[in-house]
Amino acid sequence: MTNAFNTNLSQAVFNAAQDLMPGGVSSPVRAFKSVNGDPIVFDRVKGPYAWDLDGNRFIDYVGSWGPAICGHSHPEVIAALQEALEKGTSFGAPCELENKLAGMVIEAVPSVEMVRFVNSGTEACMAVLRLMRAFTGRDKLIKFEGCYHGHADMFLVKAGSGVATLGLPDSPGVPRSTTSNTLTAPYNDLEAVKALFAENPDAISGVILEPIVGNAGFIPPEPGFLEGLRELTKENGSLLVFDEVMTGFRISYGGAQERFGVTPDLTTMGKVIGGGLPVGAYGGRKEIMSMVAPAGPMYQAGTLSGNPLAMTAGIKTLELLKQEGTYERLESLSQRLINGICESAKKAGIPITGSFISGMFGFYLCEGPVRNFQEAKQTNAELFGKLHRAMLEKGIYLAPSAFEAGFTSLAHSNDDIETTIKAFEASFSEIV
């Protein structure tokens, strides 16, 4: 594919977009700045593949940043959406589909006894922070360096995702007063969390984290870390919140909390539960969720929340994921892929460390292990940029950032994985 690789139409559309939208994109990481390139403009997606405007086909490991766990445009999801479209695109009123998806989430996720649907992961995290404060009567929050909880002001402190990709310390426009109650600790460091509790007695509403960090690359929790946080929050009368926007229904049907056997008080979700349509949700113990309006005094609302199309896509996606062998297959695909990537890099003499859990994986171009964001920043981002371009030319679409997780889907075949590993072998040899 390298000799015929042509992105003229993508380039033309992106050039025009820069006069119409800030940076030419609707979300910063899509601009390819951290890989020193120009973005590929997609025309259509199907299964594990994406096609750009120039007709290039890519094996896709971004999966719309996580939602496409069953593959893009799954025929059963599309059929369900076509039927739902006939009934309308938005009601602005209760619909029965909300009940069905809510019931499926409550049945699956250990921490969730009640759930509220919103339109994005950012919305879910904003609302859950307000709820934490309302329930505990405390203002302070502990988050972890490199964890990303959306672009709300109070979370843009040592954040991951696009903030990490662009190397931004924080964001202009966020008042110091807004983030003064946001405390940070290194991921996988229980002692740092203990110190924050000791320094702020009876002041911390809760601890929020990605149970697997996917917005600073891929950093799994060390044994005992999540369990330790659960114990610390209980001891201090604080809440534990898992941001499972990325890991929910991807790591296992019940999310990371089911996989690791640690149950938080509250959980935020998104991505997979919308089946590719905009959605978010937050849920938890009934005692806490009963504070949300109109049942309780904590206000949160949304015009398009519980949108019937998003509910439809989410229901069908979760039905597909409940089928036997789903997560075993995702685990097998990710294991073969990450093992092949690491072996290929080592053959080329390139330092690498990589890991995976279920349908989620990541690697860093440095010596491992990587246990936190500071260690993640040791990755060779410049070399990753060269790798990204080389892989594009071979028909492989990776996240355009050294600080984002990758995703396998049920649509990826063993042949797709082998093709990808061969592309890595060739690309590592080219860039060394």
From Swiss-Prot:
Gene Ontology terms, MF aspect: glutamate-1-semialdehyde 2,1-aminomutase activity; pyridoxal phosphate binding; transaminase activity
Protein family membership: Belongs to the class-III pyridoxal-phosphate-dependent aminotransferase family. HemL subfamily.
Leader sequence segment: none
Gene3D superfamilies xrefs: Aspartate Aminotransferase, domain 1, Type I PLP-dependent aspartate aminotransferase-like (Major domain)
Phylogenetic lineage: Bacteria, Bacillati, Cyanobacteriota, Cyanophyceae, Synechococcales
Superkingdom, taxonomy of origin: Bacteria
NCBIfam families attached to this UniProt entry: hemL, PRK00062.1
Keyword DNA repair: no
Metabolic or biological pathway: Porphyrin-containing compound metabolism; protoporphyrin-IX biosynthesis; 5-aminolevulinate from L-glutamyl-tRNA(Glu): step 2/2; Porphyrin-containing compound metabolism; chlorophyll biosynthesis
SUPFAM superfamilies attached to this UniProt entry: PLP-dependent transferases
Annotated protein name in UniProt: Glutamate-1-semialdehyde 2,1-aminomutase
Catalytic activities: (S)-4-amino-5-oxopentanoate = 5-aminolevulinate
Gene: hemL
